[in-house]
A protein has these predicted regions:
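Catalytic-core signal marking the mid-to-C-terminal active-site face
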Residues: 1-102
Length: 102
């Protein structure tokens, strides 16, 4: 499930690569899922954080083969930068909690 900031060209390329891989390997589609996909407790769980998504990208054999390791590493590093920048920010919760403890 892509975010609103996804690159539509990369997203489409990834979907096409996955579809072609499925056709080539004659993979069966899993049964349709209903309910909250983020609460799915199967092995095919949707990443809940950018770090989880980055890890899934880096460990995807299919995407590394389709895009090449260099491309995957580039986008993984971009995600890591985003994570590092986010971790530098003091959130409203942290500020509020700090005042509560003071």
């Amino acid at each position: 499930i892509p975010g609103s900031d996804m690159n539509p060209y990369l997203c489409m390329a990834a979907m096409l690569a996955a579809g072609l891989k499925g056709i080539e390997e004659k993979l069966e589609l899993p049964p349709a899922y209903s309910g909250d996909a983020y609460e799915n407790d199967t092995d095919n769980q949707i990443p809940k954080t950018l770090r989880d998504a980055r890890d899934a990208l880096m460990s995807s054999k299919m995407l590394n083969e389709a895009f090449g390791k260099e491309t995957v590493q580039h986008y993984a590093r971009a995600a890591e930068w985003e994570i590092e920048e986010f971790n530098k920010v003091v959130t409203d919760y942290e500020i509020m909690r700090g005042f509560e403890k003071a």
